Amino acid sequence: MQFDKSEVHVKVADATPTPCIDFSKIQSVIDPPDLLKVQLDSFHNFIQDSVPLAKRRDQGLERVLRSAFPITDTRGLYLLEYISYSFDKPKYTVEDCIERGLTYDVSLKVKLKLSYKDEPDEADWKETIQQEVYLGRIPYMTERGTFIVNGAERVVVAQLHRSPGVVFSEAIHPNGKKMYSAKIVPTRGSWIEFQTDINNQIFVYIDQKKNFLVTALLRAIGFAKDEDILGLFDLVEEVKITSAKKEQLIGQYLASDIVDMQTGEVVSARTAITEDIVDQIIAAGYKSVRVMKSFSGNDKGPDKSIIINTILNDNSATEEEALEIVYEELRANEAPDIDAARSFLERTFFNQKKYDLGDVGRYRIRKKLSKEFEELHGYLDGQPELKKLSDTIYEKILHTIQSFSDEPIGGDILVLTHYDIIAVIYYLIKLVNGQAEVDDVDHLANRRVRSVGEQLAAQFVIGLARMGKNVREKLNSRDSDKIAPSDLINARTVSSVVSSFFATSQLSQFMDQTNPLAEMTNKRRVSALGPGGLTRERAGFEVRDVHYTHYGRLCPIETPEGPNIGLISSLSVYAEINDKGFIQTPYRVVTNGVVTDTVLMLSAEDEENKITVPVSIPLDENMKIAIESVQARTKGDYPLVPAEDVNYMDVSPVQIVSAAAALIPFLEHDDGNRALMGANMQRQAVPLLTAEAPIVGTGMESKVARDSRSVILAEGDGIVDDVTAEYIKVRYDIDADTDVRLSLLDPDEGLKTYKLIKFKRSNQDTCISQKPLIHIGQRVSKGDVLADSSSTENGELALGKNVLVAFMPWRGYNFEDAIILSERLVYDDVFTSIHIHEFEANVRDTKRGEEQFTRDIYNVSEDALRNLDENGIVRIGAEVKERDILVGKITPKGESDPTPEEKLLRAIFGDKSSDVKDASMHVPAGMKGIVIKTKLFSRKKKVGLDIKEKIEILEKKYDYKEYDLRKKFLKRLKQLLEGKTSTGIYSDKGKLLVAEDAVYDDSVLERFTAIPFLESIDFVKGVTQSEKVNENVMLLVKEFRLKLKDLNDERDNEKYKLNVGDELPPGIEELAKVYIAQKRKIQVGDKMAGRHGNKGVVGKILPIEDMPFMENGKPVDIVLNPLGVPSRMNIGQLYETSLGWAGKELGVKFKTPIFNGATYQEVQQELEKAGLPSHGKVSLYDGRTGEQFDDEVTIGYIYMLKLSHLVDDKIHARSTGPYSLITQQPLGGKAQFGGQRFGEMEVWALEAYGAANILREMLTVKSDDVIGRNKTYEAIVKGQNLPEPGTPESFNVLVRELQGLGLEIRIDDRVP
């Protein structure tokens, strides 16, 4: 932050920010984009909520609705058309939805037009009804890029899937021959695959069903004759028949039929020419003959004999025969007639409703086969007859498409055409001849991202298709009685599909909210799993591996360690997703060795075959590459190339990795595997009691904190008006002439109030709390940090603490990555964190009567109820422990259903305690803490005077707000119009309000701005002679009307809430929530880690006096095992340790960006500057004996994190508890309060020791001998000897299984 010396800038937390030394040598040319742009842009492009109706583009929801309509009935009497859609404002705030367990959503309303006529033949529609219809509610994205669904904050993860288009691949047959295939993958519709085989033929597979020859498909689409097909591939040769060429003809194949006009004899095409046939042709009077071209090794062009081979093996000779073959192979039965077979083929590939390549699919095919299309069109231009046939087929395809759509065809055709099929065959022929390359399926040009908007669009397509079917059924069953669009539409159809997607889809995830970095990474994640994607079991090594096209697009480091490795990735810092779904990364253009300032966003396809260099290449003062040959990158190679050949340069050293990996200082000195762990473990760091930013950072800390939306930023320049722990008020500067709108955003002329989040529970039970950084009267600039969150310090991400570390073994306690801590870290709450747990109790109306929250619980002591209020809910501030009552609740007993008379008597005389049972909610085992918040929601409608009074108060409140808004508007209008000349203003009744050429003064403005006339004035025509003023007046009026509408909507919403009561999930009458805060200090068993993958478990907490100490008597805070460094190859932690020590001594912080940070020499210089040894080692003394250790020890300050793997959540013990219903064995796991599994190998161990009694106990009374364990319990309680064990229940289960197989098993108790 820049400080102006003329003004006072004081921060609440720290009056003098710590100076920061930046080690970066290369400055990034452009700043990284907003890290949440991926989510926000995708969603808002889908719904286009801020775009005026007339300017909405054909994308997202608009496109889906346009494609779903019009809907007609089978008789052609009704036509339901789509006009536009709109949204209402969300009914509840984000906080309300989280507290009440509701969905943060908006209602979708669609304007539809229903037309009707008496007879299908009538040209004009008789009458039309236009109506706005409610189509359901859509979850709405919050400004943080998340969705609130049933009270839970969720994220929709982007999916990386195979791009639609054409993909060429190869496979090797066991005999060693290469086979090639081409797969055309549409967005919607049947897949078609062309495949060569070992017999040199091309087959076609549709939806991986039975195959048929490609020539049959070409015939079926219109190229009926052999000659037509051969002509497409230039395989027809006209040979003059002379005695010299007679020998050449023998052995060749006829390309067309030869007819002897005198005898009527026919020699059909595909016949091999013999001497007799040559004589026959000459006798028939032919001077020349058309034959199939033959290929020898001397031919210049590609060998196309594969087409000839395919034709020779084709059983069809006409279009009709080919159609029959195609139909039979795909439908497994004969076609009823040729028209049915033809319409089936047309429906499969040429019907836009059934087959859709999509914009991306068409773009990919056009890009991939551009040369083949050129060759094909160039060749057809020289073949008039063939071109005429091809044009006829094309017209036919266009006509087929047109018959399914009322709109004229424009732009790209999104169905297959015959040109596509022929071009694919052209490319296959090139592949067979080794003149083309197969595609790499893992190349990012062949994989695209489906963001949240596209996934929602797909759900709407499904929902609207179901709705369309229902509408058609309703229209077909209707007679000519009047119906409106609202009678046809069932809103539940669409909203149920969308709700199901958010609740159950693999890509809709419960947000990881451990800290701001975890939250942001979750939103930038790209998954190859999910519907239509890969599965863990099927995915091989290649698809998981890092590909050269990932450079600058997907992070090569950040990915999970388990079975999902490589399938889930993170977008790189600079990566963006273009409108076609391909990931782009920025590059600077290099021309003739000179680096320009032009920055282009390139997809993997754009970058292919280009030469790029890293940003670290030396440049001279003219921005020319200073060395003749540079090590560049092209595809997956790193050749030395002349500087003039370079096309692009990176924009930043950070662009290769994701935000989490970019937070690791000295990443370049860490092994990739450990860097992966470091990136992943930062996401697991719990926010601590006091946040502390790292001494050694990378410069990305501020970017992550800001873009995660965890800090509050100033929206403009202004002065802080008020600061408390609950809110911050900033009065922004307003430019009277230009900034018209800002004055209406708040009634207080530019005053904006920011409510601070205080002790909010996250999804992972961590604590989110904001605190102000500014003071009253402070001047702030746009982008300044106004408030920190629980994981930031002065606007920088702060996930851990800087602690003094020594790398040395200590009495074996830090063996195998164990960590030794000083007690100081416990006493001073250095690694103490706050965890907030939410407990929920609800009241339902059961069959036996309604449950009830109460503190009047039968048979419970007054002491146990001491902390409950009159509603039976624990008071705020109460310290609670295991088994304490949080919410008192009684529920009716289930002996019998009460009769109406009994219900009446109980209502009059009160309930007997014997009729209810205690169903109170208690604090679970192993938990203690302080109640920090309680909430009670009731569905019951408020009654009596109470509600009337509240509505009156509400009306007065909103009347005042409206009056205040109008007053502000009029004041602002006067400011704009004062002294300007009028153009003549009339009311809607025609009354002259302001004469033409009149100057606006106080008297004129008083008449003009009279409130009754205000809404009737037409401001569009302009009110002054100045266009600029008119524009500002229009903006002001528009904003005023919007604000007024919002105010009235808000008034109606609040009245609705008062009248109806709290909205709760179905079936729940009352809902109580209790929030308990726990303060957890660091303890033995907690997991800790640095940022370099150096993780470990706290093994020992030593008294401060026992810790190793320096010569000046200062003890270290933490002791790490030095053996954890060399084999893990994460040397970055040693650089960080030494530089952190220097920073602590000098009182400065360091910024060392990855691949662009401090060198070994610079670290040494900083140590020397601080008066510390340049090698970072000093002599330490044993805290127990006071003696000096033999060797010097590396010490310094390292940034350590406390991870959310706390021992309190993991340690667990059970004596008795729940049992499995069938086997009667104890359940497993802490969540089920289960026992420890005594498995097969443990049994072997006891067998090996011969411990027969213990073994018998383990397998019977301690497990599933139901009678035996009850008797054992009684014996222990009574102090008697233990009984003999009985039969384990699992043995009985085995007996029943065998009896189920028909084997009679009897247990013989007799001992022989």
Curated annotation (Swiss-Prot):
The entry's keywords: DNA-directed RNA polymerase, Nucleotidyltransferase, Transcription, Transferase
GO cellular component, one term: DNA-directed RNA polymerase complex
InterPro entries: DNA-dir_RNA_pol_bsu_ext_1_sf, DNA-dir_RNA_pol_bsu_external_1, DNA-dir_RNA_pol_su2, DNA-dir_RNAP_su2_dom, DNA-dir_RNAP_su2_hyb_sf, RNA_pol_bsu_bac, RNA_pol_bsu_CS, RNA_pol_bsu_protrusion
Gene Ontology MF: a single term: DNA-directed RNA polymerase activity
Hydrolase found in the keyword field: no
Enzyme Commission identifier(s): 2.7.7.6
Subunit field text: The RNAP catalytic core consists of 2 alpha, 1 beta, 1 beta' and 1 omega subunit. When a sigma factor is associated with the core the holoenzyme is formed, which can initiate transcription.
Name this protein carries in UniProt: DNA-directed RNA polymerase subunit beta
Gene from which this protein is expressed: rpoB
